């Protein structure tokens, strides 16, 4: 049974640290993809009007994640998720993801990365963005979506790739805001499958951590520049 949470409608105005763990008793099919969030600026307002890019590129951008287990090429959907794509590309352009790991791996669910170094140190991020889960895109196998805390508008850098269709992660309504899909794997799904199959363990408060770190060696825009 999937536990439903009540979400606070406003951003928390101070530092928050929430462990990236599966909710107790929910197992591999957990509906909550949680991330740790550490913000340098305690006061900010996330504005959909001011944050949305004014223009979209005609040609979809693709980003290649070069990992220690193979490459993954992701095509970004800027039309459906302009804020999320802009945010993701900002981290790519800053080389933020280089040297980070897939820190949470659950086969037949998803692989999550974009926030931790191999020694499980969480990286500082930019302020969070609005949740664009109500954009018509679904959390199907091979899609990439933003991880977040229980607060809907809390995604920063962490993302996950769906290892199977996860309809329980899709937008339903304000009480079930879902997880924002912003692209899909177009090359390297076999790499995703390999990562999903690695042996995992518990490291401190973090569950489902690969025993041998799966490192994102680099993340680069490879087309649509």
Which residue ranges define each predicted feature?
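Cyclophilin-like peptidyl-prolyl cis-trans isomerases
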Residues: 2-225
């Amino acid at each position: 049974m999937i536990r439903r949470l009540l979400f606070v409608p406003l951003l928390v105005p101070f530092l928050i640290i929430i462990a990236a763990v599966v909710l107790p008793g929910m197992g591999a099919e957990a509906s909550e993809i949680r991330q740790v969030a550490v913000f340098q600026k305690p006061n900010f307002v996330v504005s959909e009007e001011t944050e949305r890019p004014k223009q979209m590129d005609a040609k979809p951008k693709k980003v290649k994640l070069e990992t220690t287990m193979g490459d993954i090429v992701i095509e970004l959907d800027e039309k459906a998720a302009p804020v999320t794509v802009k945010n993701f590309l900002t981290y790519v352009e800053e080389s933020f993801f280089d040297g980070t790991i897939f820190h949470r791996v659950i086969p037949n669910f998803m692989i999550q990365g974009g926030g931790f170094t191999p020694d499980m140190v969480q990286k500082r991020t930019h302020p969070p963005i609005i949740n664009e889960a109500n954009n018509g895109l679904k959390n199907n196998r091979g899609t990439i979506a933003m991880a977040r805390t229980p607060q809907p508008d809390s995604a920063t850098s962490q993302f996950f790739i769906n290892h199977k269709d996860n309809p329980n992660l899709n937008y339903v309504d304000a009480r079930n805001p879902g997880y924002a899909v912003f692209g899909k794997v177009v090359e390297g799904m076999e790499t995703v499958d390999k990562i999903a199959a690695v042996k995992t363990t518990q490291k401190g408060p973090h569950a489902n951590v690969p025993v041998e770190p799966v490192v994102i060696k680099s993340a680069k825009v490879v087309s649509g520049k």
